[in-house]
Swiss-Prot record:
It is found in: Cytoplasm. Homodimer. The tRNA molecule binds across the dimer. ATP binds at residues 263-265, 279, 350-353. The gene is serS. This is Serine--tRNA ligase. It is an enzyme of class 6 (ligase). Keywords: Aminoacyl-tRNA synthetase, ATP-binding, Cytoplasm, Ligase, Nucleotide-binding, Protein biosynthesis. It catalyses: tRNA(Ser) + L-serine + ATP = L-seryl-tRNA(Ser) + AMP + diphosphate + H(+); tRNA(Sec) + L-serine + ATP = L-seryl-tRNA(Sec) + AMP + diphosphate + H(+). It comes from Leptospira biflexa serovar Patoc (strain Patoc 1 / ATCC 23582 / Paris). PROSITE patterns: AA_TRNA_LIGASE_II.
Amino acid sequence: MLDINRIVQNPEELLSTLQKRGVVSSDIEAKIKSVSEKQRILKLEVEELRAERNRVSKEIGIQKSQGKDITEISNSMKGVGDRIKSIEEELTKEEESLHELNLGLPNLLDPSVPEGKSEEDNVLIRQWGEIPKLSFEAKTHFDIGEKLGIFDFERGVKLSGARFYTYRGLGAKLERSLMNLMLDTHTSENGYEEMWVPVLVNDESMTATGQLPKFAEDFYRLEKDGLNLIPTAEVPLTNYYRDEIIQEKELPISVCAHTSCFRREAGSYGRDTRGLVRVHQFQKVELVKFVEPEKSGEAHEKMLQDAESILQKLKLPYRVMLLCSKDMSSASSKTYDIEVWMPGLGRFMEISSVSNFKDYQARRGKIRYKSKEGKNLLVHTLNGSGLAIGRTLAAVIENYQSEDGTFQIPDVLKPYIR
């Protein structure tokens, strides 16, 4: 959700963002200007009528005190009151129309975001670690896991359908160990407060973080209850402060949570149909920050390093990519992807997205802070995966595999395995 006054005063900024994102923008600017101008005229008219009503009310009081007949002047005021009511109703409709239009607009792009058409245009920022040179043909994590009996995809399908799975024994222990490593690192070393949050949220929450109204087909909904299964803990963590005013001295606020995440993965059929890469239910540790606007750029870089720290502890090779304009989520102003090397798949795989939303989500969710000067201002929100646990486990198996079809456990995880 954008600052409409800013858009009206500088429409080129929005048009540039829409063009770079590949959004059809032929009439968006005209609609915003038309509705905004109509609002301005209606507000002016209602202010003039209210001023007239106040003036006449004073005149009625004077004439009444003088014993004069006020019937005619009182009758004239009834029409003014009816007109004010009519304009206020029309104004409410225009405000709702503008609000709905604004909800569908993407975030303005940060100036540093490269223009591009696809992931091929993303920019490499850095690469960490050496890609392992195996003396044998690398196997995939799902082949290794199934052979060792720590994954069971067949029974996952039996229980729930395609893109579901189960862990057994060491598989379940490794998932739990990775979760604990991530939470311990982020809370003890990276400065986050751990939270526990619901995985079912209302529509207001999904709207504030940008999933609604645009991406309703991408998540699971409990229609009878009016609740939605979260696609990421970003939703409840960010909405924790929805409709609230935070004191400036409390900022920055850094929180993290481990949750199950649920995604329909609509439109992804045929891609990564095997293994832990693209599934309907998975575990993830999420990082969220609330900061003052002038500090969000620095906070973004710090959050990126926090997510990277997990891969460095696990000694997994990865690269950081700055996403181009058409490969970003519509709510993000700037996004980095962390991609881990997967020997079995023979490619890098996204394992974390770290995004700066600036005031886009805060405006939708009315998340503000009171400055030292006493002004209520919008915070900037950021979030990132720290990390997706199933994908991290897949990367561990593929990078630590042996020729005999087994794999080693990273040293940093051994204290967590009992």
